[in-house]
Design a protein with these regions (language model features):
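Terminus-proximal functional modules
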Residues: 1-62
Length: 62
């Protein structure tokens, strides 16, 4: 049985999706694998909308 390391990447703001793509691509280059799909969370505070995108990633340990 292999051990797994688990991490959640997140980004928010005007360039959230391109930023998350860059984070995920960098993680993939370091041996991480996306786990499941992207999650989007939206919050409204004082008439300001914030969207946060999240991606779970795993890495198999020796």
């Amino acid at each position: 049985m292999s051990l797994l390391e688990y991490k959640i990447l997140s980004s928010e703001g005007n360039k959230a999706l391109p930023e998350l793509e860059a984070l995920v691509n960098h993680a993939i280059s370091e041996g991480w694998e996306p786990q499941g799909g992207v999650m989007a969370s939206e919050a409204n505070i004082s008439d300001t909308s914030f969207t946060t995108y999240l991606q779970a990633i795993i890495r198999r340990l020796p």
